[in-house]
Amino acid sequence: MAALEYLSLRQAPELLNPAAAWFHEKWGVPREAYLARMRPYLSGESEYGWYLCQAAGRIAGGLGVIDNDFHDRKDLSPNICAVYTEPEWRGRGVAGQLLDAAVADLRAAGISPVYLVTDHTGFYERYGWVFCGMAREDGGWGLTRVYRHD
C-alpha cells in the first residue's frame, strides 16, 4: 500500500484545482464555492486552511475550515467542514491526522476554539472533540450535533 502524505494546500498550491474538484465530487458543493474559500488561504488573507492526504499522487482524504458549515449557530466559528476519507483508506487514522493538523495550525494562529457539525457519534471524541449542543441546519432541515475543540 502507498505511503500517506499529509499537507496543507499552502504546502502544495498546485493542488488548488484538483482539490476543489475532489471536494465537489464528494459533497456536491460547486467547485467554484471551494475555490472561493481556498484562494484566501493560499494568498495569506485567511488562516482558515484546507488539508489533504495523498497516496501515490491521489487524494485519499481532506477537510477544510470555513466560517460556518451551513447551520444556524453563526456564533460558533470557525468550522471544520467537508471531512472525507476515501473508502479504501478508512480505518487508518487519515481523518484524525487531518483534524489534528487543522486544529494545530489554527491554534498557532491564535484561533481557538474550533467547531464542527456532524451526525456521527463516537468518532470525533477520539480526537479530542467534545459535544457541545445542537444546531439547526440551514434551510430548517433538522438538527445536527455540534462539537468543539479547544
Regions found by a protein language model. Give the residues of each.
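Helix-adjacent hinge/juxtasegments
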Residues: 69-77, 81-88, 92-94
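Short, high-confidence coil segments that cap the C-terminus of an alpha-helix
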Residues: 47-48, 111
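Conserved acetyl-CoA-binding loop-helix of GNAT-fold acetyltransferases
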Residues: 85, 91-104, 116
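Conserved beta-strand in the GNAT
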Residues: 52, 57-68, 79, 84
